[in-house]
């Protein structure tokens, strides 16, 4: 049985970093996939699918549902261990509903929790624009601009209330304060995940 944790949070909340640190500390038990990283890897491969994905990411728009679902299901089924952290999903009510329907049909996938790494828009903005300023030449992300940040933030916040209600009603939502130090956030998330597996 694959135990799945979905990690959501605003752009710049630190969700990807938090999850990757936890997975690195427990490589024999936990694996981390970022939907963003999975999609960016496809873009880097230069495939036709990658070119399609790139056109959405560069604008800060949502990648089509079928592409994301296929990417996530493949990652879960091929995961080398039984505990999987996936961050950056779901980002819309449509994604949430489609994924819930899929998981409910799968006997070997247990959605254990949806962890929200909560930060204010001000903190998220400072982190994202700071990340752009600190990027080495050639390592800038096309989605780290103020205009794209505003679009990404709107895409994140618009469906957030519905996503929170949906997972709260199922008893699956856990909120972690992402405005603390990296060590504090990682420590709380790690203890929570380990307590559930």
Curated annotation (Swiss-Prot):
Consists of three domains, a large central CORE domain and two small peripheral domains, NMPbind and LID, which undergo movements during catalysis. The LID domain closes over the site of phosphoryl transfer upon ATP binding. Assembling and dissambling the active center during each catalytic cycle provides an effective means to prevent ATP hydrolysis. It comes from the Bacteria. It comes from Sulfurovum sp. (strain NBC37-1). Keywords: ATP-binding, Cytoplasm, Kinase, Nucleotide biosynthesis, Nucleotide-binding, Transferase. InterPro entries: Adenylat/UMP-CMP_kin, Adenylat_kinase_CS, P-loop_NTPase. Belongs to the adenylate kinase family. Catalyzes the reversible transfer of the terminal phosphate group between ATP and AMP. Plays an important role in cellular energy homeostasis and in adenine nucleotide metabolism. This is Adenylate kinase. It is found in: Cytoplasm. The gene is adk. GO terms for molecular function: adenylate kinase activity; ATP binding. AMP binds at residues 35, 40, 61-63, 88-91, 95, 141, 152.
């Amino acid at each position: 049985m694959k135990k799945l944790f979905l990690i959501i949070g605003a752009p710049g909340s630190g969700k990807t970093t938090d999850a990757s640190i936890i997975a690195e500390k427990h490589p024999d038990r936990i694996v981390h996939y970022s939907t963003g990283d999975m999609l960016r890897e496809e873009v880097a491969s230069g495939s036709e699918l990658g070119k399609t994905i790139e056109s959405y990411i560069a604008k800060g728009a949502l990648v089509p549902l079928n592409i994301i679902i296929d990417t996530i299901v493949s990652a879960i089924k091929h995961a080398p261990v039984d505990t999987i952290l996936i961050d950056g999903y779901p980002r819309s009510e449509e994604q949430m509903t489609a994924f819930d329907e899929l998981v409910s049909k799968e006997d070997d996938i247990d959605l254990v929790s949806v962890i929200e790494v909560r930060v204010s828009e001000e903190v998220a903005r400072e982190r994202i624009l700071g990340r752009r300023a600190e990027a080495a030449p050639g390592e800038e992300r096309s989605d780290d601009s103020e205009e794209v940040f505003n679009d990404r933030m709107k895409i994140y916040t618009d469906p957030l209330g519905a996503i929170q209600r949906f997972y709260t009603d199922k008893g699956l939502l856990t909120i972690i304060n992402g405005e603390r130090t990296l060590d504090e956030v990682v420590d709380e998330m790690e203890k929570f995940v380990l307590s559930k597996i």
